[in-house]
């Protein structure tokens, strides 16, 4: 048949992978090639099988990075001609009320207009997703193009967890409700955890944590999302690298008075808050380094983050009636920082979760009857698998 390009455009990065559709159908998960661009360090990493190359790159835009990645794929003979690419799937966070499907949505003129109309629902991620998708449509004009929205996974949440306690017309007429995010990761991790636990996907109960630059939690009952920490936008919930997380709405007028405009306040809350706002560093590794050097605010920021995650775990255990099959962790912090994970789970022995004293790793074998799993997030593969079902 052909090849699938899977694109995950973040606020300052792009992750792309190219897959052979026959290989995916045969159960192979390794892409033909992978590309990752990080704007802040001006580097692009390319992987072809076991070979990995890091390149210094001068460009600033997501479109340039996308084109660079495609050119490198082509030079490495991952594909020769544009018509070999039959499908392109782009991760997007939130397209609004009308684009709430857990499955990939084919991009039509109407879908594109609706997505553009709701671009501000995820101000850090939606704009680059739109930018790269448009570039891909021009380059691979003969292919089918899809968006896969994070929020679709959470469309199964009960109405009580979607509503805010505002006048009902805010929900019915304005469309203000909790959409959530990180849905592609959560959907994939639910499938993978159920397989590992040998539990039917429609019966598995999980607490999912995605802890990286963006952080959130998700309660899953009988294989469906029932609650999540992110809300109308991905700014809500846990504190994150540059996002403030939950905040009293009563402070908003004061912030507008201080910063001068709503636009500036939104920029501060999404791009200059969280760990960055408290410490000047967005990366947990650098925040920990500051803490080790005696920076009091860095220590406070880490303690606050750990406490927020602990509170959510407790709340979701109660929401799931303490019938939890596993806690599943993903994201850069969860996948690489076992010390932070260990501090998060300390004290949960009383509800059946017990971690080994060996602080070098956390695996399900080291726990009591509620295992903690660390699963590496792979949104690109999850999207490729999902979109393949739409085209075969």
Question: Which functions belong to the PLM regions below?
Answer:
Residues 4, 13-60:
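Short glycine-rich, Thr/Ser-proximal phosphate-binding strand/loop in the N-terminal lobe
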Residues 72-85, 195-200, 313-325:
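Phosphate/pyrophosphate-binding loops at sites that engage ATP/ADP/AMP, CoA/4′-phosphopantetheine
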Residues 73-125, 144-146, 152-161:
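Short beta-strand-loop/turn "lid" adjacent to the catalytic site in phosphate-handling enzymes
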Residues 156-256:
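Glycine-rich phosphate-binding loop of actin/hexokinase-like ATP-binding domains
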Residues 248-251, 255-280:
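Oxyanion-binding "anion nests"
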Residues 267, 271-280, 284-320:
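Adenine-nucleotide phosphate-binding core of ATP-dependent small-molecule kinases
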Residues 325-347:
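Glycine-rich phosphate-binding loops at beta-strand->alpha-helix junctions
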Residues 335, 339, 356-392:
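Glycine-rich phosphate-binding/hydrolytic loop that grips phosphoryl groups
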């Amino acid at each position: 048949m052909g090849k699938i390009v899977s694109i995950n455009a973040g606020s300052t990065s792009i992750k792309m992978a190219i897959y052979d559709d026959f290989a995916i159908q045969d159960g192979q998960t390794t892409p033909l090639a992978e590309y990752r661009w990080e704007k802040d360090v001006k580097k692009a990493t390319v992987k072809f099988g076991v070979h990995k190359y890091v390149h210094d790159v001068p460009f600033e835009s997501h479109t340039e990075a996308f084109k660079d990645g495609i050119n490198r794929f082509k030079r490495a003979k991952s594909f020769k001609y544009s018509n070999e690419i039959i499908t392109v799937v782009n991760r997007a966070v939130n397209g609004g009320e009308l684009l709430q499907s857990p499955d990939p949505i084919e991009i039509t003129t109407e879908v594109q207009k609706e997505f553009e109309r709701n671009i501000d629902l995820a101000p850090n991620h939606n704009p680059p997703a739109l930018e790269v998708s448009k570039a891909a449509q021009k380059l691979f004009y003969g292919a089918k193009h899809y968006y896969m929205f994070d929020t679709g996974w959470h469309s199964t949440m009960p109405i009580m967890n979607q509503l805010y306690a505002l006048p009902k017309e805010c929900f019915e007429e304005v469309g203000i409700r909790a959409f959530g995010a990180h849905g592609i990761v959560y959907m994939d991790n639910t499938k993978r955890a159920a397989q590992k636990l040998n539990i039917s996907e429609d019966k598995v109960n999980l607490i999912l944590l995605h802890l990286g630059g963006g952080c959130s939690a998700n309660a899953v009952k009988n294989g469906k999302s029932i609650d999540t920490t992110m809300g109308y936008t991905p700014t809500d919930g846990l504190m994150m690298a540059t996002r403030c997380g939950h905040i009293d709405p009563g402070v908003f007028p004061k912030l507008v008075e201080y910063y001068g405009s709503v636009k500036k306040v939104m920029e501060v809350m999404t791009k200059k808050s969280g760990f960055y706002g408290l410490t000047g560093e967005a990366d947990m590794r650098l925040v920990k380094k500051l803490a080790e050097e005696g920076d009091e605010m860095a220590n406070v920021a880490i303690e606050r983050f750990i406490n927020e995650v602990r509170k959510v775990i407790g709340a979701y255990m109660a929401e799931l009636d303490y019938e939890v099959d596993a806690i599943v962790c993903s994201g850069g912090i969860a996948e690489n920082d076992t010390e932070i994970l260990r501090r998060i789970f300390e004290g949960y022995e009383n509800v059946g979760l017990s971690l080994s004293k060996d602080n070098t790793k956390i695996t399900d074998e080291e726990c009591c009857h509620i295992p903690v799993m660390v699963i590496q997030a792979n949104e690109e593969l999850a999207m490729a698998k999902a979109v393949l079902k739409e085209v075969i």
